[in-house]
A protein has these predicted regions:
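Helix-biased detector of long, well-ordered alpha-helical tracts
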Residues: 1-200
Length: 200
């Protein structure tokens, strides 16, 4: 505690994968999660799609003056639980407060680092015509869960965000199918944008 940097072990001979993302979502709490779960899952998944064993995260908060402490505690607790679920450590962080009206409650940035095993070279550039595309779950749950809260929409069934760390799933797929060409965690633009990227 009290240090300016987190120190972590990395492979002596090998490659690392690193990704960073900033999370701005309204509302910050929604069915199935909150902005804290998104912040951990989003970066864990981005690093994991390289085939890396995700090890460490950093997190930075930008808080609007007057943001309720009980909500902040809930977000931080969710981040800790999600990191534990993913098997990663949050080793450093920072908090800044901006004037009232200078932010929409809370923004979170996370960065992640992982070790890429030897021989793993996953990339959308590897895709070829005729490749099979596998989808790990239903489409649109997260977006609809947030939209329903934001717009006050009611549905006949409960719709929850499916945000989850996918690093263990990716590792299992690679173990079973080591010739897998690439992985993606579709976010903005969804599956259609991802497939368009592959086609290009």
């Amino acid at each position: 505690a009290g240090n300016d940097a987190g120190v972590a072990a990395l492979p002596a001979n090998g490659r690392i994968a690193m990704s960073t993302d900033s999370f701005v979502v309204t509302p910050q709490f929604f069915p199935g999660g909150n902005i804290g779960r998104l912040a951990v899952c989003g970066t864990v998944n981005d690093v994991a799609t390289s085939g890396a064993n995700v090890r460490y995260l950093s997190c930075g908060f930008i808080l609007e003056e007057g943001y309720p402490m009980d909500k902040l505690r809930q977000i931080v607790q969710t981040m800790a639980e999600t990191a534990h679920e993913a098997g990663v450590s949050i080793i450093t962080g920072d908090t800044k407060v901006v004037e009232r009206g200078g932010a929409d409650g809370v923004y979170i940035n996370t960065a992640g680092v992982g070790e890429v095993p030897a021989g793993v070279t996953l990339s959308g550039a590897n895709c070829r015509p005729g490749d099979a595309i596998l989808v790990s779950g239903t489409l649109g749950d997260h977006g609809i869960a947030i939209m329903s809260q934001r717009e006050g929409l009611a549905f006949s069934s409960d719709i929850e965000s499916d945000a989850a760390p996918l690093n263990h799933l990716i590792a299992d797929v690679l173990a079973a199918a080591p010739d897998t060409r690439c992985f993606r965690d579709p976010t903005r633009g969804g599956l259609a944008s991802t497939l368009n990227e592959f086609a290009q």
